[in-house]
C-alpha cells in the first residue's frame, strides 16, 4: 500500500520509507495495530492540518471554522450511529486522553476507582500506580481468577469493600466476553459510575460480535484504531445529557486545546467505512481467524491464558510453554519479521518490561486478507521458532516462509472496492 515518500528532509523521508518497508515485510500481530485505508490517510494528511480552532461546532473561539464544524458534526453523527449512542465527543487525541477526560468529568482528585489489574489484562489508565489514574486518584484493582476469567461475584465483593466512585470494565489483554449487564449490577450495588473502555473490541461491538456496553455503562470510550481500523485517536460516548456536558468540558478546556481537525476528518472517513457491509464481514473474519489461530496453539499444548479466545486477541504463557520470557520471545520472533508484544500474564512474577507472555492479535493481518489457513501456518511457524530459540538455521528457514506470506498478502489501499 505504502508509496515511497519524498521530502526535502531526506533524513525523515528515509526513516518513513524504512518504516513503510518494515510494515510491508513484517507479519503484524500486535493487537493494538491495524492498517488504515488510503482514504483515511488522505484525510489525515489533508489541508485540515493547517486549521486551528477551539471549542465545539457552532461555539468556536476562532473564525473560519465553517467547514471543520461540518466535518466534526458528521464525525459525531456517524459515531453515534455506529454505537447507537446519543452523544459523541470525537476530539480526544488518544485513548489515554479520553480516559483522563472521563476521570475529570466524573471524579474529583482523590476519589476511588476500581479497575482490572495490569497483569490480568487491564490498562495503565485504569488505575496503575505510575499513570495519572493511580497518581491523582485512589485506585483499587480486581483480578481474573486462576482460570484467567473474570469472577463477577468476587468483583462485587471487592466493590462493596472499597466503595469506588467509578468502576472500569474493558481491557487491553482479555480474550473473553465482558458481561456489561453484570458490571451494571455491581456499579448500582455500590452507587458507582460505570465506565466501559472498549478500545480493543469496538469493531466487534459494531458488528454485534460482542455485546455493547451502551445502555449499561454511564460512559464509553474507544480508540479509533485497533479493530475499528481508523486513524490514531479516540472518542467518548454516552446516552446521558448531563454526563455529555461534563465530558465536553473535560475534553475542552479540561484536557485539550485545539482539536486536530485532520484527525477528526480521518475518524469520520473510518466511521464511514465501518458503516459499510464489508466492515461487518471483516469483523466476522477476525473472529474466525483468531479462534483457529488460538486453537492451533492449544492443540500443541501451549498454555493460552483464559482458554479459547472469544475476540480478536489472546495471550500465551511462553514461560510455562517454552521456558522463555515474553521479552525473549518477542526478540526471537522479531528476527523472523514476526511482530508481537511481550505481555504480563495473571499473577506474573516478571516485571512488565520482561513478562511471562506474549499477546497475539489478528486484526492487522486479517486486513491483509489472511484467512484461517494462513493463521494455522503462522501458528506452526511461531511454535517451531519458540521451541528451538537458538536454532539459527531453522530461524532462517522460518524467515523465508514469513517473507512468502507477507509478499502474498500486501497491505491494501482500500477496503471497499472489490477490484
UniProtKB/Swiss-Prot annotation:
Q: Which cofactor does it need?
A: pyridoxal 5'-phosphate
Gene name, Swiss-Prot/TrEMBL: glyA
Matching NCBIfam families: PRK00011.1
Q: What is this protein called?
A: Serine hydroxymethyltransferase
Function text: Catalyzes the reversible interconversion of serine and glycine with tetrahydrofolate (THF) serving as the one-carbon carrier. This reaction serves as the major source of one-carbon groups required for the biosynthesis of purines, thymidylate, methionine, and other important biomolecules. Also exhibits THF-independent aldolase activity toward beta-hydroxyamino acids, producing glycine and aldehydes, via a retro-aldol mechanism.
Q: Among its keywords, does the record have rRNA-binding?
A: no
Q: What does the record list as GO biological process?
A: glycine biosynthetic process from serine; tetrahydrofolate interconversion
Q: Does the keyword Transmembrane helix apply?
A: no
Q: Name one Pfam family in it.
A: SHMT
Give the Gene Ontology MF terms in alphabetical order.
glycine hydroxymethyltransferase activity; pyridoxal phosphate binding
- Where is the site Plays an important role in substrate specificity? 225
Describe the family membership recorded for this protein in Swiss-Prot or TrEMBL.
Belongs to the SHMT family.
Alphabetically ordered keywords of this record: Amino-acid biosynthesis, Cytoplasm, One-carbon metabolism, Pyridoxal phosphate, Transferase
What reaction(s) does this enzyme catalyze? (6R)-5,10-methylene-5,6,7,8-tetrahydrofolate + glycine + H2O = (6S)-5,6,7,8-tetrahydrofolate + L-serine
As stated in the Swiss-Prot or TrEMBL entry, residues carrying the post-translational modification N6-(pyridoxal phosphate)lysine are: 226
Broad EC category: transferase
Q: Where in the cell is it found?
A: Cytoplasm
Q: Which GO terms describe its cellular component?
A: cytosol
Q: Which CDD domains match?
A: SHMT
Q: Where are the transmembrane segments?
A: none
**What quaternary arrangement does the UniProt entry report?**
Homodimer.
Give its E.C. classification number.
Answer: 2.1.2.1
Residues the entry annotates as binding (6S)-5,6,7,8-tetrahydrofolate: 118, 122-124, 242
SUPFAM superfamilies xrefs: PLP-dependent transferases
**What is the predominant subcellular site recorded for this chain?**
cytoplasm
Amino acid at each position: 500500500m505504502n508509496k515511497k515518500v519524498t521530502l526535502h528532509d531526506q533524513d525523515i523521508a528515509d526513516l518513513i520509507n524504512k518504516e513503510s518497508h518494515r510494515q510491508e515485510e513484517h507479519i503484524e500481530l500486535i493487537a493494538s495495530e491495524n492498517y488504515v485505508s488510503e482514504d483515511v490517510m488522505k484525510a489525515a494528511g489533508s489541508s485540515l492540518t493547517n486549521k486551528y480552532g477551539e471549542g465545539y461546532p457552532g461555539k468556536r473561539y476562532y473564525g473560519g471554522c465553517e467547514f471543520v464544524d461540518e466535518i466534526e458534526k458528521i464525525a459525531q453523527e456517524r459515531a453515534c450511529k455506529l454505537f447507537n449512542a446519543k452523544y459523541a465527543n470525537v476530539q480526544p487525541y488518544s485513548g489515554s486522553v479520553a480516559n483522563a477526560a472521563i476521570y475529570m468529568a466524573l471524579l474529583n482528585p482523590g476519589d476511588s476507582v476500581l479497575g482490572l489489574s495490569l497483569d490480568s489484562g487491564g490498562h495503565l489508565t485504569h488505575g496503575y500506580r505510575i499513570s495519572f489514574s493511580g497518581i491523582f486518584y485512589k485506585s483499587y484493582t480486581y483480578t481474573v481468577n486462576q482460570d484467567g476469567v473474570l469472577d463477577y461475584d468476587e468483583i462485587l465483593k471487592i466493590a462493596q469493600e472499597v466503595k469506588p466512585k467509578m468502576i472500569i470494565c474493558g481491557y487491553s489483554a482479555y480474550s473473553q466476553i465482558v458481561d456489561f449487564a453484570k458490571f451494571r449490577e455491581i456499579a448500582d450495588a455500590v452507587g458507582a459510575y460505570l465506565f466501559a473502555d472498549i478500545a480493543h473490541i469496538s469493531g466487534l461491538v459494531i458488528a454485534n460480535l460482542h455485546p455493547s456496553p451502551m445502555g449499561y455503562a454511564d460512559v464509553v470510550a474507544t480508540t479509533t484504531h485497533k479493530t475499528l481500523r481508523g486513524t490514531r485517536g479516540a472518542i467518548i460516548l454516552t446516552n446521558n445529557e448531563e454526563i455529555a456536558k461534563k465530558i465536553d468540558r473535560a475534553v475542552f478546556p479540561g484536557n485539550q486545546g485545539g482539536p486536530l481537525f485532520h484527525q477528526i476528518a480521518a475518524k469520520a472517513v473510518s466511521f464511514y467505512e465501518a458503516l459499510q457491509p464489508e466492515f461487518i464481514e471483516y469483523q466476522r473474519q477476525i473472529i474466525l481467524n483468531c479462534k483457529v489461530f488460538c486453537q492451533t496453539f492449544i492443540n500443541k499444548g501451549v498454555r493460552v491464558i483464559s482458554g479459547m479466545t472469544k475476540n480478536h486477541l489472546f495471550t500465551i504463557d511462553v514461560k510455562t510453554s517454552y521456558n522463555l520470557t515474553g521479552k525473549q520471545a518477542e526478540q526471537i520472533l522479531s528476527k523472523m519479521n514476526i511482530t508481537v508484544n511481550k505481555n504480563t500474564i495473571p499473577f506474573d512474577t516478571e516485571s512488565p518490561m520482561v513478562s511471562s507472555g506474549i499477546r497475539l492479535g489478528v486484526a492487522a493481518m486479517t486486513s491483509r486478507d489472511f484467512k484461517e489457513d494462513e493463521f494455522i501456518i503462522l501458528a506452526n511457524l511461531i511454535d517451531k521458532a519458540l521451541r528451538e530459540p537458538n536454532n539459527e538455521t531453522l530461524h532462517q528457514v522460518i524467515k523465508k516462509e514469513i517473507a512468502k506470506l507477507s509478499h502474498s498478502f500486501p497491505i491494501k489501499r482500500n477496503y471497499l472496492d472489490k477490484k
